[in-house]
Each structure stands twice: as structure tokens, then as C-alpha cells.
């Protein structure tokens, strides 16, 4: 067994007598705090992205999006850690692995039950805010895309090209049009 493995640590017996390790609950709580901080950071990064979108400074949009993706990767890693710790707590509580945080809170002894419920409530609040902000950012991107396409369409009326003799063609000649297919 590697040093620091949970099986090396002595289990403490909580007052309810189920033999639940306070260490397991403490480790789960630590992982939950980390995940909460990451969700708050994601919320901040989404707000930054929104500020970039609303300010029209799209030059920084790629950077803002990359920062959001970086935080999302960190959240995925934290979720894996949370899953491992939550399964360990579930087993110690006599539950099947894969239980929800609410189910763990319902079966955990005091004061852990309140702490786990508080984490769950915070996650619900944060994910609601994140979903609303992400939806708003998608809407801003869609509006920006439509505005760009409308601008490009208005440019088509004044596009002039050259004929084989090198003379410009009139705008009424619709044989050539400016079209950006990347949109």
C-alpha cells in the first residue's frame, strides 16, 4: 500500500456506533470545498467572458474561452476525486457506491449531515448561476454572429470586382459576391 493510503489511517468511531471514519468524511469535505472553489472560479471566468462579449473587445474572446475550458478541465478532475471519496463514504455508511450528495447527507452523522447538505445547496446555487450565465453568453455570441452576417450581406451590394480587361464591374453585376463561408 502506498504511504498515505486511506487504509493506513486509523478510523475514528463516531458517537452513533456505525464505525464511520471521520477521516473519510473530512476528505470528502475537502474535495467538495475544492470543487466549490472551482465552480466559483468558473462563474468568474464566465462573467469575464461576458464582459469581453458585451464590450466588443472580441480580440480577447479566445483567451477568455480558453480560461473557461481550463477551469472546466480542473472541475472534471475534481469530480473524479469527489466520486472516489463519496463512494468511500457511501460504503462506510452501508450504502451502495454512486449515491448522491443528498443521500450521503441524509445518512451521515451530525455535524457532517449539515455540512454535506450545505455543500449540496451551494452546488445547486452555483450550477444554476453557471447555467444562466453560459446561456447568456451563448445568446450574446449568436447575436454577434447574426450582426456580423448582416454586415457582410450589406457589403455584398457594394462589392466591385475586376473583369478580364482589368476594369471594375458595376455593383449591379451580381456575378461576384463577397461571402465568408466560415460563418
Describe each PLM feature range.
Residues 2, 15-104:
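Extended, charge-rich alpha-helical scaffolding segments
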Residues 5-8, 13:
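Intrinsic-disorder-associated, low-complexity terminal segments enriched in Asp/Asn/His/Tyr and depleted
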Residues 12, 17, 136-137:
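Generic cytosolic/nucleocytoplasmic N-terminal low-complexity/intrinsically disordered segments
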Residues 2, 100-183:
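Short terminal interaction segments
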Residues 7-8, 28-32, 178:
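Short helix-onset patch at the extreme N-terminus, typifying the N->h transition
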Residues 11, 68-70, 156:
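Hydrophobic alpha-helical segments
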Amino acid at each position: 500500500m502506498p504511504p498515505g493510503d486511506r487504509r493506513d489511517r486509523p478510523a475514528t468511531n463516531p458517537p452513533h456506533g456505525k464505525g464511520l471514519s471521520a477521516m473519510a468524511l473530512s476528505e470528502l469535505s475537502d474535495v467538495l470545498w475544492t470543487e466549490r472553489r472551482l465552480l466559483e472560479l468558473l462563474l468568474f471566468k464566465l462573467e469575464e467572458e461576458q464582459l469581453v462579449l458585451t464590450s466588443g473587445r472580441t480580440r480577447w474572446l479566445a483567451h477568455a474561452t480558453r480560461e473557461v475550458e481550463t477551469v472546466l478541465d480542473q472541475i472534471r478532475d475534481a469530480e473524479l476525486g469527489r466520486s472516489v471519496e463519496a463512494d468511500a463514504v457511501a460504503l462506510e455508511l452501508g450504502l451502495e457506491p454512486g449515491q448522491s450528495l443528498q443521500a450521503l447527507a441524509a445518512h451521515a452523522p451530525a455535524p457532517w449531515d449539515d455540512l454535506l447538505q450545505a455543500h449540496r445547496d451551494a452546488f445547486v446555487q452555483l450550477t444554476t448561476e453557471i447555467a444562466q450565465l453560459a446561456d447568456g453568453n451563448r445568446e450574446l455570441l449568436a447575436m454577434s454572429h447574426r450582426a456580423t452576417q448582416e454586415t457582410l450581406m450589406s457589403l455584398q451590394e457594394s462589392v466591385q470586382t475586376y473583369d478580364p480587361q482589368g476594369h471594375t464591374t458595376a455593383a449591379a453585376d451580381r456575378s461576384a459576391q463577397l461571402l465568408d463561408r466560415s460563418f
